[in-house]
Structures are given as structure tokens and as C-alpha cells.
Amino acid sequence: MPHPSWNDRYASGELPWDTGQPEPLLVEFVTTGGITPARTLEVGAGTGTNAIWLAERGFDVLGVDVSPLAVEQARAKIEGRDLRCRFATLDFLAAPVPDGPFHFVFDRGCFHVFDEPEERARFAVQVAGALVPGGLWLSLIGSTEGAPREVGPPRRSAREIALAIEPALEILELRSAEFRSHDAKAWFCLARQRTIPAQPSTRHD
């Protein structure tokens, strides 16, 4: 399970990740044609900023979050608006994802909150199960690169990311980026639902 008191965080307003603006790396990915409007799942949608931004651009979006209060706040933002956007409370590791499959899954800093390798691998399996064949997952992940810091996103290495994701999905791109709202290094990880299983490593004889 992730941090046990997400609902308390939303109740207190202690939300350094919630800037009220769409994630710049997502905006760049969409506006440069990385993905066109499609059925989309956002995991860890929080108060809905990114999901709503996508819906405003023609995406059909389901945003899920483990915090009922976050979901309540997200729903309030779209009340009375003519958007293909909805929100649901979901423990992503433990429950089936409703309304799938999807062509695109997005998470900003949700995958990286899980400390155990088995949890991160389970997260990737859940994403793969929610995608159509060839569907894309964009995950923005705190990085072990950069200067030491005492606050900010959890840090994960490229190796930890690959070990969790590669059995379930094909990594298309893993590059250094930045969480601009935190001035912290990040990984931009784009993966694709496999159409054939990954093959085992081979020896050079």
C-alpha cells in the first residue's frame, strides 16, 4: 500500500505536487503529437488537473485515486461541464480497473510512491492489463539523479524502473527530465503494452 494517509493530506491541503496547472511534460507530450485524443486512464489523478486538461482537448478520461476526498474535489471541478471526464476511488494495486481497456495511461508520481519492488511490478502489471494491445503508458518518476535533497518526490533508479516494467510492458523511452514544480530530477518513462512476450536474455557463445 502507498502512504496510509493520503486522505489526511488532501484534508490538510498539504499538496506540494498539486500546482493547479497541468504537468508540463504531459503538455509537451500531447502537443507534440505523442498521443492523440483517446480513451485515457490517469492513475493517482488527485484533484483532477491533468485529467481535466486532457478532457478539454478531446480525450475521454477516467481519473482514479486512492483518496476519496481527492476524487470528491476532482468531481466538483467538472460539475456542470460538458467533458468526457469522470473520477473514481480506486486502490490501483488491489482492484480491477473499471471501464477499460484504454489506449493511454498516465501517472505523474504515482508509480514511484511504492517502496517495494513487488509493488512497482504489480503496478506495471495493472497498467498492462488496463491497456489495449500497443497502448501507451507515460509515467513521470522521481529520479536518483541530481543533488541530494531532504524533500520532494521519492527517488527511483533506471534499473529499478526497468526491473519493474519490462516483464509486463516494452519500454520505448526512458530519459532524464525534471519535475519543474519541485526543481527535482525525474524520469520520463514511455512504455507500450506488449503484443508478444519479452524474450529471455541470451549468452554470447
Predicted regions and their residues:
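Class I (Rossmann-like) S-adenosyl-L-methionine-dependent methyltransferase catalytic domain
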Residues: 1-41, 47-99, 114-130, 135-205
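Conserved acidic residues
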Residues: 103
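A conserved beta-strand element that flanks and buttresses the S-adenosyl-L-methionine
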Residues: 106
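Short catalytic micro-motifs in class I SAM-dependent methyltransferases
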Residues: 109-113
